[in-house]
UniProtKB/Swiss-Prot annotation:
Lipid bilayer topology: Multi-pass membrane protein
Cross-referenced Pfam families: Cytochrom_C_asm (PF01578)
InterPro entries: Cyt_c_assembly, Cyt_c_biogenesis_CcsA, Cyt_c_biogenesis_CcsA/CcmC
Protein name: Cytochrome c biogenesis protein CcsA
Function description: Required during biogenesis of c-type cytochromes (cytochrome c6 and cytochrome f) at the step of heme attachment.
Compartments in which it is found: Plastid, Chloroplast thylakoid membrane
Organism: Zea mays (Maize)
Keyword presence, Chloroplast: yes
Length: 321
């Protein structure tokens, strides 16, 4: 009872905080000069992170197993992972290029997890026999870590495509473009500072210098993030294969979840392979990664929505009216 009450409190704190953060984030996108609000948004993210961490620890202690047994718990863990990705550049004291992707991703994931759609999953339940294994934490956590990382990398690639295919793109009037500020807020500040510095120089700068510089940074970050995510996905699939052999007597059953996990792995393997070809590097490889973004959501959320196959534990069903 104590843990259930604590989880309830932490869930409401995280949902309330995330609602405030969403409001602040939207305001800062519309009014660029309000830097103080950006700091408040970051503090709200920190408060949400500690609330999520407390929730995960509380449920782990109360249930006796790592909280990854249904869609609700996995979404909470996914938002926690996205915040970790958001924090890594800050710990390294480097420019946080990922913040424009990780911040809204964390907000949306946590907001959906704590919404009323998953109410029936809020209560911790006893694991079914197939899930009562030490592989639960290893396999599922690796898969969710890979999903979070690959989603961030795919969004960076999608951002690259948006910039390259947008005609008449004026980097000197970005303040008027709310959509671009959503994805490239920190990049815009960097480009404004760069432009101001170069105005005082005497050497010529070609017109698309700023656009080229931004796309190169996005391409580099996307490749690095997806490479990490692909490694985590590979480890997660291998762990799942070993677990499947213990639980069902076969390493691979072509279950819908397994099939889409293989498709996801193949898509990002193609992306990494295409990076070795100079003719495919950049726009073409970014297109492959953007397709991967949709594939990940089908693999992770779509299969749970259908509730079919051997991986249908804790699947999501729409509440009846």
């Amino acid at each position: 009872m104590l843990f259930a009450t604590l989880e309830h409190i932490l869930t409401h704190i995280s949902f309330s905080t995330i609602s405030i953060v969403i409001t602040i984030h939207l305001i800062t996108l519309l009014v660029r000069e309000l830097r103080g609000l950006r700091d408040s948004s970051e503090k709200g993210m920190i408060a949400t992170f500690f609330s999520i961490t407390g929730f995960l620890v509380s449920r782990w202690v109360s249930s006796g197993h790592f909280p990854l047994s249904n869609l609700y718990e996995s979404l909470i863990f996914l938002s926690w992972t996205l915040y970790i990705l958001h924090t890594i550049p800050k710990i390294q004291n480097s420019k946080n290029d990922l913040s424009t992707i990780t911040t809204p991703s964390t907000i949306l994931t946590q907001g959906f997890a704590t919404s009323g759609l998953l109410t029936e999953m809020h209560q911790s339940t006893i694991l079914v026999p197939a899930l009562q294994s030490q592989w639960l934490m290893m396999h599922v956590s690796m898969m969710l870590l890979s999903y979070a990382t690959l989603l961030c990398g795919s969004l960076l690639s999608a951002a690259l495509l948006i910039i390259r295919f947008r005609k008449n793109f004026d980097f000197f009037s970005l303040k008027k473009n709310v959509f671009l500020k959503t994805f490239f807020f920190s990049e815009i500040e960097y480009l404004y500072a760069k432009r101001s510095a170069l105005k005082n120089t005497s050497f010529p700068v070609f017109p698309n210098y700023y656009k080229y510089q931004l796309t190169e940074r996005l391409d580099s970050w996307s490749y690095r993030v997806i490479s990490l995510g692909f490694t985590l996905l590979t480890v997660g699939i291998l762990c799942g294969a070993v677990w499947a052999n213990e639980a069902w007597g076969s390493y691979w059953n072509w279950d819908p979840k397994e099939t889409w996990a293989f498709i996801t792995w193949t898509i990002f393997a193609i992306y990494l392979h295409s990076r070795k070809n100079p003719n495919w590097k950049g726009t073409n490889s970014a297109l492959v990664a953007s397709i991967g973004f949709l594939i990940i959501w089908i693999c992770y959320f779509g299969i749970n929505l259908l509730g079919i196959g051997l991986h249908s534990y804790g699947s999501f069903t729409l509440p009846s009216k």
